[in-house]
């Protein structure tokens, strides 16, 4: 941790170590330095000069490779338009550092830690380098406790661990960002501590929507910014790959400060971790590395590990991380989601089949997993209910081929009952979201874990066999389902 702003470092003695650009390939630059003056890997370089139109250029780069012959290869964190061979490059002598602490709350930053919300500069009294080692094994905390989200399907079938890493896996358009925004709404508001949101390579519109949503809900307090509870770090789709590759580390560095120095419990939301891998792949190819499986970078597992291992709980505080993971072509065996799976304590898998049925959130309870779903952690009642729900849904899945060919009438009495209950369970797993109120017209519902377990127990036991399955669709707790059934009966 250093208390000097980065600008001060650049303007003093280190400026003597200057080089010049020898080659530009898209976002990648080759820079020559004097013999014996090569910068270290991950050092931050600054290109200063003027483009042909006479405009000032100030581009920050990060050293990726040492090429020999006193040359290094660096990746730019902003557009390389206007850069020319021969331009002066200054070695800052340190990795990229970003502002940390309370000054970041309520503000939006880019990958360099510069505010981009037009609210003026940040007083960066304390900055921290984005490249660090993971906490030592002896510092890690091993307490196990559940993080209640208020979303039925998540809390029941794949509960989240406090201080754990959670992956939201899904293809294009199945609802990952809506789910992550609902989790921010339910958890960040109720959560006393601070949150950090890293927008990695996603749509600018979604970043804007999230910012407006947070201002409305007072998670960002515009009247008194210092009372805000969240810091936002954006490196959106239109940014060069260098920025998208490092913006996750910028967000993580801000979260680590709250954990290690302020000793707080922090929430870290990342949307989307796949874009971090994708940007790494672009940089790797531009740097001339041989691609690995499916065209990904050969260092995929190392890059993912160096990010994920820093997201952990220590004896000082915790970081609970919720990460959206895009699944290319709905293929969970693709190297990017498959590598992310290995780091997750809980996986929430979104299904296109459920989304097509109109069941939102489209979370598949059979594919979703959690290390927390053990009877000695969640209790016998929760465990038995979750297993009962999964068994019923699995049996329904097995019977679907028979139903498609022969029809429901050919099933045994017991199987017909299983199908009826499974269809009720499937619909009861849907839930109206607060963040989707403007689209659906239905008010959002937060359902406590106790109410969730009670509702599914009643369906499994057969108490609600007489109610129509439509009564269970898009409701909160089980009392709302029975009330909806009564309304449907009156209408019919």
From Swiss-Prot:
Signal peptide: none annotated. Pfam families: ATP-synt_ab, ATP-synt_ab_N, ATP-synt_VA_C. Its EC number is 7.1.2.2. GO terms for cellular component: chloroplast thylakoid membrane; mitochondrion; proton-transporting ATP synthase complex. It is found in: Plastid, Chloroplast thylakoid membrane. It comes from the Eukaryota. One of its GO terms (molecular function) is proton-transporting ATP synthase activity, rotational mechanism. ATP binds at residues 170-177. It is a peripheral membrane protein. GO terms for biological process: proton motive force-driven mitochondrial ATP synthesis. It catalyses: ATP + H2O + 4 H(+)(in) = ADP + phosphate + 5 H(+)(out). Keywords: ATP synthesis, ATP-binding, CF(1), Chloroplast, Hydrogen ion transport, Ion transport, Membrane, Nucleotide-binding, Plastid, Thylakoid, Translocase, Transport. Produces ATP from ADP in the presence of a proton gradient across the membrane. The catalytic sites are hosted primarily by the beta subunits. F-type ATPases have 2 components, CF(1) - the catalytic core - and CF(0) - the membrane proton channel. CF(1) has five subunits: alpha(3), beta(3), gamma(1), delta(1), epsilon(1). CF(0) has four main subunits: a(1), b(1), b'(1) and c(9-12). HAMAP family: ATP_synth_beta_bact. Belongs to the ATPase alpha/beta chains family. This is ATP synthase subunit beta, chloroplastic. The lineage of its organism: Eukaryota, Viridiplantae, Streptophyta, Embryophyta, Tracheophyta.
């Amino acid at each position: 941790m250093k208390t000097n702003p980065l600008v001060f470092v650049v303007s003093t003695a280190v400026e003597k170590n200057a080089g010049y650009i020898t080659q530009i390939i898209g976002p990648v630059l080759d820079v020559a330095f004097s013999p014996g003056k090569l910068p270290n890997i991950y050092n931050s370089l600054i290109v200063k000069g003027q483009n042909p139109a006479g405009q000032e250029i100030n581009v920050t780069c990060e050293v990726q490779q040492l090429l020999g012959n006193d040359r290094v290869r660096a990746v730019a964190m902003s557009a390389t338009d206007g850069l020319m061979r021969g331009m002066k490059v200054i070695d800052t002598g340190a990795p990229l550092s970003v502002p940390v602490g309370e000054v970041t709350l309520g503000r939006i930053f880019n990958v360099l830690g510069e505010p981009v919300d037009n609210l003026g500069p940040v007083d960066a009294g304390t900055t921290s380098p984005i490249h660090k080692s993971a906490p030592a094994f002896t510092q890690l905390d091993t307490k196990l406790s559940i993080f209640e989200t208020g979303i039925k399907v998540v809390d029941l079938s794949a509960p989240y661990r406090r201080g754990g890493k959670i992956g939201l896996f899904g293809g294009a358009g199945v609802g990952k960002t809506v789910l992550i925004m609902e989790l921010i709404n339910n958890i960040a508001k109720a959560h006393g501590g601070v949150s950090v949101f890293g927008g990695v390579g996603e749509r600018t519109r979604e970043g804007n929507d999230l910012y407006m949503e947070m201002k409305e809900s007072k998670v960002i307090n515009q009247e008194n910014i210092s009372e805000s509870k969240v810091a936002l770090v954006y490196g959106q789709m239109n940014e060069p790959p260098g920025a998208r590759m490092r913006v996750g580390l910028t967000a993580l560095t801000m979260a680590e400060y709250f954990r290690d120095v302020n000793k707080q419990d922090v929430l870290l939301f990342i949307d989307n971790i796949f874009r971090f891998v994708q940007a790494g792949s672009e940089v790797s190819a531009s740097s001339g590395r041989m691609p690995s499986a499916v065209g990904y970078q050969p260092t995929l597992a190392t890059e993912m590990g160096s990010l994920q291992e820093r997201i952990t709980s220590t004896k000082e505080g915790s970081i609970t991380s919720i990460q959206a993971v895009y699944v290319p072509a709905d293929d969970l065996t693709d190297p990017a989601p498959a590598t992310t799976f290995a780091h997750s304590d809980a996986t929430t898998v979104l299904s296109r089949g459920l989304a097509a049925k109109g069941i939102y959130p489209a979370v598949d309870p059979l594919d979703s997993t959690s290390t927390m779903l053990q009877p000695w952690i969640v209790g016998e009642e929760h465990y038995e209910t979750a297993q009962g729900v999964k068994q019923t849904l699995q049996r329904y899945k097995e019977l679907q081929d028979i139903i498609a060919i022969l029809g429901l009438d050919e099933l045994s009495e017991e199987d017909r009952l299983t199908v009826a209950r499974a269809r009720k369970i499937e619909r009861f797993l849907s839930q109206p979201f607060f963040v989707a109120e403007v689209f659906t017209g239905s008010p959002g519902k937060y359902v406590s874990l106790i109410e969730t377990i009670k509702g599914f127990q009643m369906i499994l036991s057969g108490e609600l066999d007489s109610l129509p399955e439509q009564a269970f669709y898009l409701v909160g707790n089980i009392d709302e389902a029975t009330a909806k059934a009564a309304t449907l009966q009156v209408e019919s």
